Amino acid sequence: MLVADLKQCHLEEACELFAATYRCQREAVPILDGSNASTERVLPMLKWCLEKHPGVAVFGSGKMIAYMTGFYIDEFLGVHKGALCLEWAHASTNQESFETHRLMYQALGQKWVDDGCLTHAVYFLNYAREAQDAFVWNGFGSICVDAVRAVEPIDVRAPEGVRIAAIQETDIAAWLPLVDGHNRHVARSPAFKPYLEPESPAELGDMLRRPGNLAWMAWHGNEAVAYMK
């Protein structure tokens, strides 16, 4: 296997690799939108990544069998500049996924560090277990898991005495201690997510007012006991 720089001329092949992985994921989760893996969607994003950020590819038997790129974010998950590789920014043929991702990160991770990125994060489709394992072997941990389900009623009731309602701006004073408590909790072992400063009422208010954002609170009597946003 040969590891080389990912170039613009490789990106249509890269889209095909991601589409193949996404099709396998859709077999397990059919409600996923098939258009998420279309070349029309993925190709412009990959082109944008390569305009200012590095990428690598792996070639075997005369064809590209894997690729990986990403983009940089200042103060990413803390005070340091970081690199983020989303689920469409990497893919590999399943037969060699562990080894190809290990080789790609060995090459690309060094480029990221050379560019001043000290925090590295990678998104995976759940199907790509061998790729995930390669990063676990390199010392990565899990910080977030997203789940997808059909939009339909859930047959469940709140416990007796518990009321669940959308959070209003008038609830921010009760909400703020829960947010801060959660942030302090994940800053401790074993997560160690950096805790820089408490979120402010103004920040939470801005979040609630942003179109498309939703947040819910569970109340036990007059006490706020849980939230989801």
What is each of the regions a protein language model found here?
Residues I167, L176, R184-A202, D206-R209:
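Acidic, serine/threonine- and glycine-rich low-complexity intrinsically disordered segments
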Residues M1-E16, Y22-E27, R163-L178, N183-A187:
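A short beta-loop-alpha structural element at the N-terminal edge
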Residues Y72-E75, C85-G161:
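Acyl-donor-binding surface of acyltransferase catalytic domains
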Residues P201-G205, L214, W219-H220:
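ER/Golgi luminal nucleotide-sugar-dependent glycosyltransferases, focusing on the catalytic module
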Residues C15, T21-L103, W219-K229:
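Conserved donor-binding loop and adjoining core beta-sheet/short helix segment
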Residues L46-L50, D206-P211:
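Short loop/turn motifs at secondary-structure junctions and domain boundaries
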Residues M45, A107-K111, D206:
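A generic secondary-structure signal
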